[in-house]
A protein has these predicted regions:
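Alpha/beta-hydrolase-fold enzymes
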Residues: 186-290
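Alpha/beta-hydrolase active-site loop
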Residues: 138-163
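Short, surface-exposed "cap/lid" segments of acyl-processing enzymes
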Residues: 80-126, 350
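N-terminal cap/lid segment of alpha/beta-hydrolase-fold proteins
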Residues: 34-84
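Short beta-strand/loop motif that positions the catalytic acidic residue
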Residues: 333, 339-341
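Cap/lid segment of the alpha/beta-hydrolase catalytic domain
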Residues: 96-97, 123-147
Length: 398
C-alpha cells in the first residue's frame, strides 16, 4: 500500500467519522431502525474509494433507509443531490447489485456532472430489496419486479418528500445497468406505468437480452452454498452429500415457489429460459430418493395445471425453443429510449446486439473497449451521453 493510498484511507476514515455523527446524512425515517450508521459508513467509504472526478459529487451523497410497504426491513436508498437540478434519474442496479459499485457510481457521476440528481436503488434480486415475498420467491420475473419497483419508488418519493423537497417537484427519468437495464427497457414498453412517476426518458446500459443468465445465477447460488471437498488434484468439488443437500434445498425452494404461481406466471416460465432451471432442479433432485416427492409434485400438480396440460416429456422438449426475448419482441421502442452497449459484453451474443441495434437505430451506442461496462470510464462515453441527454435540458456540467 503506497503513501497516497494510506493518506486517502485515513482521510476516508476521518470523513466517515464526521459524516456518521451528522444526523442529516443518514436520518432513519422508519421507527426502530437498529442500524442507521454502519450502512452510512459503508456507503461513504465506497464512494470515496471510487476515484470521482468531482469531489462535489462524492460529498453530495445522502443515504436513507426507507420503509416500503410489504418489505420486512427498510430499503437502502442512495441520493446524489444536485443543487438546482430539474430532473432526477432513478438508476437501477445490475443483477444482485447495489449502488456501492464503482461502475454504478461512475454512471451516477456522469448524470450528476451533467446537471441531474440521481436516486440509486439496489437490484430487485438483492436481499436488500427482495424482502417482499414475491421478489424473494421469483427473482427475475419482470412483471413482479416492475410492480414492486414502482410501488417502492412511490413510497420513496412520499417518505422522502418532506426531507428532500426537490423530490416532490422534480421531473423523472429511468436508467438501469445490466439486469436493471432490462427492467428499464421493459418499463419503457409498459402500456400502464408501474409508478406514479412519469419518466421522460429511459437509458439502458448493457441490457442482458437472455434471462437464462440470471436464472443460472440462481441455480449457482444453491451449489455455492453446499459443502465441498478436496480432490487428489487439489481442486474443490461438491461431494455427493453436498449434492444431496443442494437437491433438498432446491426441492424446498422450487416446491414452495411453484405452488404460489398463478396461471400467468406459469405461462411466463414457458416463455423464458427459466424452464431450464426447473429441468436442472429435476435432475438434481433425482439423485436423492427423498426428493421423489418433488418430481411427483411436478407430474401430478404443476404440469396438468397448465392449459393445455403438459407431460414431463413435453416440458423437457420446451428447452429447445429459441425465443428468449418474448416480452421485448413485438413493440418498437419509443424515441425516449437510449441504449449503450459493449460489443464484448458476455451476457448478450452478437446476434442479440444486432437485433437490438436494428430496433433502436440511432438510439443505440456501441463500444468495443473495456470489457463488460468498461466503456463507462471513456471520454467518448461521457461525450456521447452528454449529447444524447441534452434534449432533457439539464444544467451545464462543471
Amino acid at each position: 500500500m503506497g503513501p497516497r493510498t494510506l493518506i486517502r484511507f485515513f482521510k476516508s476514515l476521518t470523513l466517515v467519522t464526521l459524516v456518521a455523527s451528522c444526523a442529516s446524512f443518514d436520518t432513519p425515517i422508519v421507527e426502530n431502525d437498529e442500524h442507521p450508521f454502519p450502512e452510512a459508513m459503508f456507503a461513504t467509504v465506497s464512494s470515496l474509494a471510487y476515484q470521482a472526478r468531482s469531489p462535489a459529487f462524492t460529498s453530495s451523497l445522502v443515504h436513507y433507509r426507507v420503509g416500503v410497504k410489504g418489505f420486512r426491513r427498510p430499503l437502502p436508498v442512495w441520493y446524489w443531490k444536485r443543487p438546482g437540478a430539474k430532473l432526477t434519474f432513478v438508476l437501477l442496479s445490475g443483477y444482485g447489485g447495489t449502488p456501492d459499485s464503482s461502475v454504478f457510481q461512475a454512471i451516477a457521476e456522469n448524470f450528476w456532472d451533467q446537471g441531474f440528481s440521481v436516486l440509486g436503488l439496489p437490484s430487485s434480486t438483492h436481499p436488500d430489496f427482495s424482502q417482499a415475498a414475491s421478489s424473494k420467491r421469483l427473482p427475475g420475473h419482470l412483471p413482479r419486479d416492475l410492480k414492486e419497483l414502482g410501488e417502492a419508488l412511490d413510497d420513496v418519493r412520499e417518505r422522502l418528500g418532506g426531507r428532500e423537497p426537490d423530490l416532490a417537484t422534480t421531473r423523472w427519468a429511468l436508467a438501469g445497468i445490466s439486469y436493471g437495464a432490462l427492467q428499464t427497457l421493459q418499463e419503457s414498453l409498459a402500456a400502464t406505468p408501474h409508478s406514479s412517476l412519469r419518466f421522460e426518458a429511459y437509458v439502458a446500459f448493457n441490457p442482458p437480452l437472455r434471462l437464462s443468465y440470471a436464472m443460472s445465477r440462481l441455480d449457482e447460488s444453491f451449489e455455492r452454498g453446499a459443502p465441498q471437498h478436496l480432490t487428489p488434484t487439489g481442486s474443490l468439488v461438491p461431494s455427493m452429500a453436498s449434492k444431496i443437500h443442494a437437491a433438498q434445498t432446491r426441492q424446498l425452494y422450487w416446491s414452495e415457489t411453484l405452488a404460489a404461481f398463478s396461471q400467468e406466471e406459469l405461462e411466463f416460465l414457458l416463455a423464458w429460459d427459466f424452464r431450464k432451471s426447473l429441468l436442472r432442479a429435476i435432475s438434481w433432485t433425482s439423485q436423492d430418493p427423498r426428493s421423489l416427492s418433488f418430481g411427483n409434485y411436478l407430474q401430478t400438480q404443476l404440469l396438468p395445471s397448465l392449459n393445455p396440460p403438459l407431460t414431463l416429456d413435453q416440458w423437457s422438449a420446451l428447452q429447445d425453443l429459441k425465443d428468449p426475448r418474448n416480452p421485448l419482441e413485438s413493440t418498437p421502442y419509443p424515441p425516449s429510449v437510449l441504449v449503450f452497449h459493449s460489443l464484448n459484453d458476455p451476457l448478450s451474443t452478437a446476434e442479440d446486439i444486432g437485433w437490438l441495434k436494428q430496433r433502436l437505430g440511432s438510439q443505440m451506442q456501441l463500444y468495443r473497449q473495456g470489457g463488460h461496462l468498461g466503456y463507462v470510464w471513456s471520454e467518448r462515453f461521457r461525450s456521447d451521453l452528454r449529447a444524447s441527454l441534452s434534449p432533457l435540458n439539464p444544467m451545464p456540467g462543471n
